[in-house]
């Protein structure tokens, strides 16, 4: 709610970082260790290893939204967009205000030339983060193209 009310970009950025930190905490130590290792694999481009570990994360802790979101990100990086969308949908089911998952979904819509889907998704992001310059700019560009 503070994020929605924030009009100051610095304050909004701090809130975003805090939210990401909270989202990245698993419900148990074993899942957290797997999650952290999977992130390390993702960071160095070992995407297959990252998927393997993120899959274990979501098997162990299926209610851990960030596990699904991170696996969606790796699928996106591999170009497996339908698998990414599936994991994004699961992320959003668990955490409907997951602006990161929404941003990834909007990018996929753009890659698929689905401007209507992208516009709707950027509007959803702006409902969560009204000060999101990226979402405002992208929505403006899409609306110009749709006219």
Give the residues covered by each predicted segment:
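Residue-level signature of tetratricopeptide-repeat
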Residues: 71-72, 78, 105, 112, ...
